[in-house]
């Protein structure tokens, strides 16, 4: 029997912008970085976008985009931040989806409800809005309709599936 494994990356960071300043303020707990988005981007997102493959002598042989080999979703608020603050990582995520389509016929990326709201607890209108906004943001960034959607905290009920 052939067996398969699917590794899925769920990438989400909440919006950290101060709405009065329209800027992310310094977060001391993220030191030495300015804020947690920057720290996580430098320590996690960028290294996976440009992962080093070493040769037998420990020298860099090539760089690979790990995102092209996994299933992943990136929250719309994080994608917006990446587009502005780490455009190389944003583009690597979009390119990973293109590479997966070329290799397998199916994209690696899936959508996520827009604001990470627990959809079963939302009103019907808010639930539909979260799903529509998440799907639309995905279409604008990845250039295709999503084939699936990551549900925040994997919370699900029948009305959520119907949304």
Indicate residue ranges for each PLM-predicted region:
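Carbohydrate-active enzymes and regulators
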Residues: 1-163
């Amino acid at each position: 029997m052939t067996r398969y494994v699917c590794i899925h990356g769920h990438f989400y960071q909440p919006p950290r912008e101060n709405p009065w300043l329209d800027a992310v303020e310094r977060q001391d707990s993220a030191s030495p970085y300015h804020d947690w988005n920057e720290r996580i981007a430098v320590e996690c997102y960028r290294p996976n976008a440009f992962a080093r493959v070493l040769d037998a002598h420990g020298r860099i042989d090539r760089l690979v985009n790990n995102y092209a080999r996994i299933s992943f979703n990136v929250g719309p608020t994080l994608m917006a931040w990446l587009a502005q603050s780490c455009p190389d990582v944003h583009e690597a995520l979009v390119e990973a989806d293109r590479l997966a389509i070329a290799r397998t016929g199916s994209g690696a990326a899936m959508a996520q409800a827009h604001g990470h709201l627990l959809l079963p607890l939302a009103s019907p209108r808010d639930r539909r809005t979260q799903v529509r906004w998440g799907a639309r943001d995905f279409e604008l960034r990845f250039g295709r309709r999503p084939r699936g959607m990551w549900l925040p905290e994997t919370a699900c009920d029948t009305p959520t599936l119907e949304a």
